[in-house]
Amino acid sequence: NYIGKEGGDGYDYEDKITARVRLGLDAKVNKTTSVKARITTGSIELGDSSKEAQANWDLAYVEHKFGKNVVVDAGRYTQKFGGGLIYSSNFDGVGATAKLGDKVTLNGAYGYMTAGRFAKTSKADNGDVGLINANVAVNDRFGFGGMFAHVGTTNVRMGNGKKNNEFDNVYGFNAKYNIGKFGIDGEWVKASGLSDSDIWNVGVKWGDYKINKKNSWAIRLDYFDQAKNAPVFKTQKYESNDLLKKTRYEGYKAWQLGASYAPEKNIGINAY
């Protein structure tokens, strides 16, 4: 993964190359139940030996299927909030996904976020989350969805520089359209408990990148508009100055250009 940044706020950022290895495990208990886990090295910056890379279990959960249309996950699994703009990572709790016919999918979850801004957060400082996602596939090209979540009180530093944020209810909408290798998507999210708390994103892509498909590739251009109190629970790539505690916490407006390529099956190269 190659990262290059130019500071627009008076700070300069060095280019760097990072690498990460993940190993997924899937043990089937019976026809309807599986135990799944994943080992990861975390992000390693090439040329920097000051930080020791240690493998750890970042996912471990049980997956059970009730018939063909209902799946339940319990443990530490990957949970998406809406289209993934504000969070799509590790989640400790229980989630259920149900398909209603060929077009409608419902997802509900309860638990705790444990990655992004919530990485290395104690349970006392974390807040529980109740979440509902709904998605509708209108046809093979167009789909849209909505999300609603209630976020408990947390003691975790967010993009506005504050630790105690009463986001309360978080809701949003997303949509996507694809035709051939071209795709466009967008999402808008807001928190009811704080003013100046919306975030939206529009992205376009060209290609059909899949990490399990050799020689597949894609390029993508995104625009982000993040208000200072937006409920962004993952760490966005454009927030480097925030993570270095050198920002004025006024929100972000950013363009992001990225590319992905799979030289071999299950090997991916990403640059942005």
Give the location of each predicted region.
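Sequence/structural signature of outer-membrane beta-barrel proteins
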Residues: 2-7, 40-49, 76-84, 111-121, ...
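Active-site cleft segment of glycoside hydrolase catalytic domains centered on the general acid/base Glu
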Residues: 86-88
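Solenoidal tandem-repeat scaffolds enriched in leucines and small polar residues
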Residues: 112-145, 150-152
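Outer membrane beta-barrel transmembrane domains
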Residues: 132-134, 144-149, 153, 157-159, ...
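Beta-barrel outer-membrane channel/assembly domains of diderm bacteria
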Residues: 1-73, 94-108, 124, 132-140, ...
